[in-house]
Amino acid sequence: GDPRCIDVEDDFAYVTQYGGQVSKLNIKDMTLAGTFKGGDNLEGIVEKDGKLYVANTYTVDGSNNWVYNKEVFVIDAKTMTLEKTITVVDNPTKLYEIDGKIYLISQGNYADVAGALQSIDPKTGTSKVILNDVTKITEGNNDLIYCISATYDANWQLSNSFFTYNPSTGAIN
């Protein structure tokens, strides 16, 4: 499937692919070292303590409609097997590891479910919504998360806001 995202840890690159596959590549000799098959259209990926956290974004149903998933897979990086599935907000896309936690953005369903910045505690496997109406994130300097919120009012007027979220303090600037 179409490669989507990549994360490198130690001697391996982990690549998510549409069609429900994660490929484990040995970066020393560029050989395929393992494969996980599951889900549908996989996007963001991050490694934390030997576990891969992978966003299972959406499925296309029999009528060619997009159905947004609410899943982050936890995959054992050594064996490339599914350990568990964590429920998150619809349409998860990007994941980052900061200060021992996993942070992710979900895009929502573009109708009645808004995008959200969320965290996953790797120790408990639970997810929590931090902020709603967040549409894009990236990790930045000083372990800050840079956020964009793009929302529309009842007349379809776009409003953009840019801010940072500090995972250590919870401060929004």
Describe the residue ranges of each PLM region.
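Predominantly soluble domains enriched in secretory-pathway, periplasmic, or organellar proteins
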Residues: 1-173
